[in-house]
Amino acid sequence: MVILKGIPSVLTPELLYVLAQMGHGDELVLADANFPTSSVCKCGPVEIRADGVRIPELLKAILKLFPLDTYDESAAVMDLVPSDLLKGLKVPIWDQYSELLKQAGSDGNMKPVERFAFYERAKKAFAVVATGETALYGNLIIKKGVIPPEEQC
């Protein structure tokens, strides 16, 4: 836990370090509890643990510090598999993500990415944060943007 002014306590020192290291265009995966984080991270991304933390809480905290990309899609989710599409499965957590992204200045759109393509994209991410999120299809990728000079300290 980090106890600093203005830094949400859900952001660990390891996660803060990774956020600071990331550059424009680097991607961060916020992985749900069922995501194969350790397997994916064997391919290169840094593995960060946030066990027990729900993604909306973590996303809200991250977006206080993390500029979203405005030149390209800023967020992506794992698309439903065909059988879940046929069932008409709803994914209410996506609405929460969209609202948080809008509050951070994004249009709130999230590109749906086919399941196995999502895994491959995650292997190229800068880091994967393993969370305690239990919602189905809770995985989210966010892309880092730039901080304009007038917003820099």
UniProtKB/Swiss-Prot annotation:
Its EC number is 5.1.3.29. Keywords: Isomerase. The active site is at 24 (proton donor), 69, 119. Substrate binds at residues 32, 78, 119, 137, 139. Coiled coil: none annotated. Involved in the interconversion between alpha- and beta-L-fucoses. This is Fucose mutarotase. It comes from Danio rerio.
